[in-house]
Amino acid sequence: MHTFEGDLVAENITIGIVVARFNEFITSKLLAGALDTLKRENVREQDIAVAWVPGAFEIPLIASRMAKSKRYDAIICLGAVIRGSTSHYDYVCNEVSKGIAQTSLDTGVPVLFGVLTTDSIEQAIERAGTKAGNKGSECAQGAIEMVNLIRSMDL
């Protein structure tokens, strides 16, 4: 039996990051977590590109353009959608998740989902670096692992 696994060796890896500006008090913490992890795992600063978009809904388009450019081994998508009193939350969450997943499938580039979808600001804060860890950091680790997994499968 042959088992494929990705590791956290970040040699010659280029990463694109798409960050939503809406709820920036949360998304900036997600970005800081991602950047800290990438640097800790020895991804060079010149091998990281960050694109800011207005809101979570715009993330899939820029993630798709980055993935199709073939300049990045993985894309990390960061945003925060917090439930309000209208159905807008449901539409945004559904479309963003579909768009991100479709980008990965269409391009073969790992596209990591670091978009928080929470019922409250408190839940978002917890997932951006307090009680529940930092989703940006988790996505950075996942990006490195997925790049190496794909490389190990390219026989």
Curated annotation (Swiss-Prot):
Disulfide bonds: none annotated. 5-amino-6-(D-ribitylamino)uracil binds at F22, A56, F57, E58, A80, V81, I82, F113. Its EC number is 2.5.1.78. Pathway: Cofactor biosynthesis; riboflavin biosynthesis; riboflavin from 2-hydroxy-3-oxobutyl phosphate and 5-amino-6-(D-ribitylamino)uracil: step 1/2. GO terms for biological process: riboflavin biosynthetic process. It is an enzyme of class 2 (transferase). It catalyses: (2S)-2-hydroxy-3-oxobutyl phosphate + 5-amino-6-(D-ribitylamino)uracil = 6,7-dimethyl-8-(1-D-ribityl)lumazine + phosphate + 2 H2O + H(+). HAMAP family: Lumazine_synth. This is 6,7-dimethyl-8-ribityllumazine synthase. It comes from Bifidobacterium longum subsp. infantis (strain ATCC 15697 / DSM 20088 / JCM 1222 / NCTC 11817 / S12). The lineage of its organism: Bacteria, Bacillati, Actinomycetota, Actinomycetes, Bifidobacteriales. The gene is ribH.
